[in-house]
A protein has these predicted regions:
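Helix-turn-helix/homeodomain-like alpha-helical modules used for DNA recognition
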Residues: 17-103
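Helix N-cap and loop-to-helix transition residues
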Residues: 5, 22-25, 44, 59, ...
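Short helix-start
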Residues: 1-17
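Charged/polar, solvent-exposed surface patches and flexible loops
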Residues: 10-11, 30-33, 49, 53, ...
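Short acidic, gly/pro-rich beta-turn/loop elements at beta-sheet edges
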Residues: 14, 41, 123
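Long, low-complexity, charge-rich intrinsically disordered regions
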Residues: 74-195
Length: 195
């Protein structure tokens, strides 16, 4: 089935498609981890070198566009009493909980985070998530690949999620932080040509 909603049309219109082929989830996460100063041990040395070289030429808009296929977004409704269960099962991202302060956003009870495709059905059933209720208070980024780790996603991933948001404040906060992270990464790697 294919569902076309106002939100999906606005989201598609929001995407900038100008700059080349999109990254695979593995490379998209690596790029967002790399600009966050995190380890990307799932890449080979040559892949790291090529990615570093590519990241030194990108701006925030290009990076968001290239990383757009890292996960698909599922917006769902959940009872307030079950939100904690969802929070424990995913890697939090965007402006969820205490992450909101990092972006000067107001903290809400909404939950946003990442999980593997193989875990989606289990979490939907356990937390009794509903896609047919509004407003959605759970946004799940479902991916075929998520780097190993626990806790919140790195700040680069959170920034990209916010930059993809249809909310103007969230989008602006995400792009501002991505611009800062990229600028720092590019100045730290300027002129370096080592593997």
């Amino acid at each position: 089935r294919l569902y076309i909603t106002n939100e999906s049309v606005r989201r598609l219109n929001h995407v900038d498609r100008k700059r080349g082929r999109t990254f695979s989830p593995r490379i998209a996460f690596a790029s967002l981890y790399m600009i966050s100063g995190e380890s990307v041990n799932w890449l080979s040395a040559s892949e790291k070198y090529q990615l570093k070289k590519r990241l030194t030429t990108l701006n925030a808009t290009d990076l968001v566009s290239l990383c757009r296929n890292r996960a698909r977004l599922c917006s769902m409704w959940c009872r307030e009493s079950r939100l904690e269960k969802v929070t424990q099962e995913i890697r939090l991202s965007a402006g969820t909980g205490e992450l909101a302060a990092e972006f000067n956003l107001t903290e809400t009870s909404d939950v946003e985070g990442y999980l593997l495709e193989s875990d989606l059905q289990r979490i939907v059933e356990q937390a009794k998530l509903r896609s047919d209720f509004q407003p959605a208070n759970v946004r799940l980024h479902v991916s075929s690949y998520i780097p190993n780790g626990s806790g919140n996603m790195p700040i680069g991933v959170c920034s990209a999620d916010l930059a993809d948001s249809l909310d103007v404040r969230e989008c602006g906060a995400g792009f501002d932080k991505l611009t800062q992270l990229l600028s720092r990464f590019q100045s730290d790697n300027k002129g370096k040509d080592s593997r």
